[in-house]
Amino acid sequence: MKKSLYTITLFIWAACLLSSCKNEVEDYFDKTASERMEQEIVKYRELLIKPQHGWVMEYYPGGMDQTFGGYALTVSFTANGYAVFRSVLEDDVNNSVSSFYALNKDMGATLNFDTYNEIFHYFSNPDIGDGGGEGKGLLGDYEFILDSGTESEIIMTGKKHKSTIRMHALQEPATEYLRKAKARMNSYLIIPAVSGLKGTFAGEPAEAEFITSQSYILTQGEESTTFSFMFTDKGTKLYAPIELNGKKIENLSWDEQKRAFTTPDGQTNLALVYDPKGLREDQLLGNYVFHYGNDKQIDVSIKKTKQRRHYYGRLTFHCKTQLQRT
């Protein structure tokens, strides 16, 4: 009798459990795709405006291979559709620019910055001379597919160039974060005439070829891989782990004193290869006389325009040249 009673009780419990699961499934699929999408939009609308100090955006332009490394941007969102951007590339990190943002529906929920913002759209403007030059620019995105979101982190993917962009809720005012990140970045960028890295990777000899200031080709033996990084308030952060010859490192730190990228275990130590007699970009600014051909010359002025960090120039003809400062 007891056995029969136990069996009946167990059967009833299992039936209730299955009924509960069924109701949950039915509740979910009772909603149309449009309704589920609207739920996602509402979720992200609430998340975006929640952090007191806004978000730090780990922004990687440079197309699918993140050729130009990453940059710290901060952005705060308002309930009435404004996004306020600041950038580590600004001479004064207190500078901010506001523009509209929108949450839209595509293959999923998307975050779009369609109205021009001088700070943010610098990375996606094809008409600037930086990066790949006019017509390409820095190959950055301004429309993103929202992949996941919590109160502390939002992960999204650029719609055109496919880089993963992460946003973390700031725990301090945006200007404080950017000030620290900028100081760390400048301690690296101030070093002139960098051509690469040399040392060890995971305990074995390795060297890296300079692509851009924050992107390298790392070679060890016959194998090679690329890696890109950015500067945060605490140091450097890789876009993705570096994997080479079966070894993998998740983090790479910039050692300002050693002028090297290292890991805590000491197994990776990649020191900068640079010309100590080289000139920094700020030392090249000024007015020059440009001599070419046998007896031709033209006045040239080298200037730094707002935000630009990459300098490219070309002539439309081959010639022997000489620059003389005036």
Set out the residue ranges of the language-model regions.
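Bacterial N-terminal signal peptides that target proteins for export
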Residues: 1-9
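C-terminal motif of bacterial Sec signal peptides marking the signal peptidase cleavage site
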Residues: 16-20
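Acidic/polar, low-complexity intrinsically disordered N-terminal segments immediately downstream
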Residues: 22-110, 149, 161-163, 172-194, ...
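Hydrophilic extracytoplasmic domains
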Residues: 27-49, 249-326
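N-terminal glycine/threonine-rich, aromatic-flanked beta-hairpin/loop signature
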Residues: 64-108, 199-238, 296-326
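General beta-strand recognition
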Residues: 84, 110-112, 155, 217, ...
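Extended alpha-helical scaffolding regions
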Residues: 96, 155-226
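Beta-sheet ligand-binding and adhesion/scaffold domains
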Residues: 114-190, 236-283, 292-294, 326
